[in-house]
Amino acid sequence: MISGVGALIGRLVWNSQQVDPARSASLAYQNAVTAVSEGKPDSIPAAEKFAAENKNTYGALASLDLAQQFVDKNELEKAAAQLQQGLADTSDENLKAVINLRLARVQVQLTQADAALKTLDTIKGEGWAAIVADLRGEALLSKGDKQGARSAWEAGVKSDVTPALSEMMQMKINNLSI
């Protein structure tokens, strides 16, 4: 009986040690993101510090939020750096795909089409095929490769794509003819 109670107490202590760091990271992430979205002074440096110190999913998510702030301010180099940091902080393949998609968009805006194409090559999974095709078309078009862009968008239209994205890619194909 006593050993059973001891084991139960030990298990509860161990569980609390595992849950408490996750809770505090979650709370710190929420506070950082809220402060940034509210435009509080010094919130961006604090969020950057949080992202740099948390080499986990919360750090990666903070990097995504920061990258959006930098894109909104047209600070694209800073956005790209945050996205690269976010990639290093997560092992989740879907989160990596989202980060890589955003990174490729930023790279296209920075006229780094070759880097964007390499970034897009790292995204795996059929669920991402249409979005990757759309961005691939944008990157190729920015390099002046109209035929490559057309091929990418045509492949995107043929993939399992939402009607809205399909129509948008079809409009891009049609605009190449003009």
Describe the role of every protein-language-model region.
Residues V36-S37, E48-A52, G59-I131, R136-A139:
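Alpha-helical adaptor scaffolds
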Residues D42-S43, K78, A115, G148:
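Alpha-helical positions within canonical tetratricopeptide repeat
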Residues A22-D42:
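Short extracytoplasmic/periplasmic juxtamembrane "stem" segments immediately C-terminal to an N-terminal membrane anchor
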Residues M1-Q17:
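Single-pass alpha-helical transmembrane signal-anchor segments
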Residues V19-R23, T57, N94, G127, ...:
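Residue signature of alpha-solenoid helical repeat architecture, marking inter-repeat boundaries
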Residues L12-S24, A51-K55:
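TPR-adjacent "capping" and linker segments in tetratricopeptide-repeat scaffold/adaptor proteins
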